[in-house]
């Protein structure tokens, strides 16, 4: 029989948009076990995206058990556990029964557009930006809460009586992990969130890290619904679920993009990462000073260690990244698989004058033009599939540059390099394009699944499993670095052509 060793590992639960994962790492930062399970995407009508919170909780239990069984360990051997999650996705439930009053409304869901238009018209964007760091749009949780209160029968009345809880997905999982309705030891389960998730609701004053009564009133949300806000890294409570991770301390909670920055070792002011997933998510550590963007970005909290002031960040999100490649594959059927785009794009030396502006749902950061629509410009009889494939990859790189330039203006200094992660960074042509279009080095780590890894690092820091940031940085390996090969003149000529193409996406 294998001898068990106390506190030899750290676990991380990564609850994402399409699946839930559990990873377990050792003290070298190596991932020793992984388990994952997808959940259903519920699409009741166009623009609506929902998840079943109960299914997700069931999947959490399943993947944690699978990851532990795979390496034959017990909770005794796990020092601590961290939780990361798809941000903004909204759940309201009855703590007396554990039953959600409605499906989780996912961050991608756009049903709250009309609520947001009315809110922006009444209050103006600047007030919300100055107070929360966010712009009023369909992403944050606040408008989703209001929609559930206004549209699900009986929910507003129950909320006003204090009978219901709201949470983003971290809050829902923490409540279940710490006992839920069972209360094995008679103690109430935690109803908490961390500052990074709270900062994505439109309800938290980013200056004080507390819920803002005036903002809650503007959205007509009872404050009794809201969880307690806690630092990202510190002592939450031990797991009180007999089935999984019994008595393991929860010591780290982060929203997914902040967790990815943590997993990249983005601890210094100016450190910046881009996650190339369904969309593109750029986050820059701006240090202890809050910077409210003047160039179309959002301000958020990168992380907070218990007993310390928060560390802030600038964020720019682009809606179309990997999803543009999926569109090429599934809707146009132009490529057989997503990875095949690189092979086709390499067949030509340039885009042949073709540009694709993927404003399928408008343009997001830093332009924020919801009425823009996707266009393909520069088509001639000379253009072929290879040129279009190249234009798709270039669109990803150009959109990233737009956000990077905005970050540099807000931060008052140029980026020295960009750290990258996510599935698309396996496309080496795209990464070279990115270095060329930015004019800086692009750095890919050894493990590109940095969201789960960053959560494990945060939990390990919170429990003392890892000593400090320096130790964590030593554990992060660099797999590859791309350096610019374009001249400055070539770079700016290409960027000017992109900007010209974007003008055709605007309504006339």
From Swiss-Prot:
Keyword annotations from UniProtKB, A to Z: ATP-binding, Glycerol metabolism, Kinase, Nucleotide-binding, Transferase
EC category name: transferase
Disulfide bonding pattern of the chain: none
EC number: 2.7.1.30
Single GO MF descriptor: ATP binding
Regulation: Inhibited by fructose 1,6-bisphosphate (FBP).
InterPro entries in the record: ATPase_NBD (IPR043129), Carb_kinase_FGGY (IPR000577), Carb_kinase_FGGY_CS (IPR018483), FGGY_C (IPR018485), FGGY_N (IPR018484), Glycerol_kin (IPR005999)
GO biological process: glycerol catabolic process; glycerol metabolic process; glycerol-3-phosphate metabolic process
UniProt-listed SUPFAM superfamilies: Actin-like ATPase domain
Binding site for ADP: 17, 21, 278, 322, 423, 427
Superkingdom per UniProt: Bacteria
Residues engaged in binding ATP: 17-19, 278, 322, 326, 423
Residues that bind glycerol: 87-88, 139, 256-257
Catalytic activity, as annotated: glycerol + ATP = sn-glycerol 3-phosphate + ADP + H(+)
Any single GO CC term annotated in Swiss-Prot or TrEMBL for this entry: cytosol
CDD domains per record: ASKHA_NBD_FGGY_GK
Pathway in which the depicted protein is active: Polyol metabolism; glycerol degradation via glycerol kinase pathway; sn-glycerol 3-phosphate from glycerol: step 1/1
Chain residues that bind sn-glycerol 3-phosphate: 17, 87-88, 139, 256
Spans through the membrane: none
NCBIfam families for this protein: glycerol_kin, PRK00047.1
Protein family: Belongs to the FGGY kinase family.
Function statement: Key enzyme in the regulation of glycerol uptake and metabolism. Catalyzes the phosphorylation of glycerol to yield sn-glycerol 3-phosphate.
PANTHER family for this protein: GLYCEROL KINASE, SUGAR KINASE
Name this protein carries in UniProt: Glycerol kinase
Lineage of origin: Bacteria, Bacillati, Actinomycetota, Actinomycetes, Mycobacteriales
């Amino acid at each position: 029989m294998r001898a068990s060793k106390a506190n030899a590992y750290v676990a991380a639960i990564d609850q994402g948009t399409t699946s839930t994962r559990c990873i377990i790492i050792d003290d070298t930062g190596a991932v020793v076990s992984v388990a994952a399970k997808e959940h259903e995407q519920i699409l009741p009508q166009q623009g609506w995206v929902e998840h079943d919170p109960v299914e997700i909780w069931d999947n959490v239990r399943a993947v944690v058990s699978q990851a532990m069984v795979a390496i034959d360990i017990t909770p005794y051997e796990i020092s601590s556990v961290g939780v990361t999650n798809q941000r903004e996705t909204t759940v309201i439930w009855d703590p007396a029964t554990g039953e959600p009053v409605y499906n989780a409304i996912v961050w991608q869901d756009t049903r709250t557009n009309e609520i947001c238009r009315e809110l922006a018209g009444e209050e103006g964007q600047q007030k919300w930006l100055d107070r929360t760091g966010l712009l009023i749009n369909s992403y944050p949780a606040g408008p989703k809460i209001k929609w559930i209160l206004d549209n699900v029968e009986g929910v507003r009345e129950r909320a006003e009586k204090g009978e219901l809880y709201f949470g983003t997905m971290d809050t829902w999982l923490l409540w279940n992990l710490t006992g839920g309705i069972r209360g094995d030891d008679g103690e109430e389960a935690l109803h908490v969130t961390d500052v990074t998730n709270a900062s994505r609701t439109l309800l938290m004053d980013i200056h004080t890290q507390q819920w803002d009564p005036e903002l809650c009133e503007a959205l007509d949300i009872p404050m009794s619904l809201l969880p307690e806000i806690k630092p990202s890294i510190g002592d939450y409570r031990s797991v009180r679920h007999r089935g999984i991770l019994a008595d393991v301390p929860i010591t780290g909670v982060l929203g997914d993009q902040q967790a990815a920055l943590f997993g990249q070792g983005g601890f210094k002011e100016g450190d910046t990462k881009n996650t190339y997933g369904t969309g593109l998510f750029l986050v820059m550590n701006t240090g202890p000073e809050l910077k409210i963007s003047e160039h179309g970005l959002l301000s958020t909290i990168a992380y907070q260690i218990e007993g310390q002031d928060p560390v802030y960040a600038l964020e720019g999100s682009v809606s179309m990244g990997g999803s543009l490649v999926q569109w090429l594959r599934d809707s146009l059927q132009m490529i057989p698989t997503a990875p095949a785009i690189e092979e086709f794009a390499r067949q030509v030396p340039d885009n042949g004058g073709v540009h694709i502006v993927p404003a399928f749902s408008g343009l997001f950061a830093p332009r924020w033009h919801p009425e823009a629509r996707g266009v393909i410009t520069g088509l001639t009889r000379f253009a072929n599939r290879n040129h279009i494939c190249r234009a798709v990859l270039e669109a990803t790189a150009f959109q990233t540059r737009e956000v990077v330039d905005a970050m540099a203006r807000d931060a008052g200094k140029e980026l020295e390099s960009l750290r990258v992660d996510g599935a698309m960074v396996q496309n080496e042509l795209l990464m070279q394009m990115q270095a060329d279009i930015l004019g800086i080095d692009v750095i890919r780590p050894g493990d590109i699944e940095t969201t789960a890894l960053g959560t494990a690092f945060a939990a390990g820091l919170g429990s003392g499993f890892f000593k400090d940031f320096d130790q964590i940085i030593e554990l992060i390996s660099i797999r590859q670095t791309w350096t610019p090969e374009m001249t400055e003149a070539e770079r700016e000529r290409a960027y000017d052509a992109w900007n010209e193409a974007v003008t055709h996406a605007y309504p006339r």
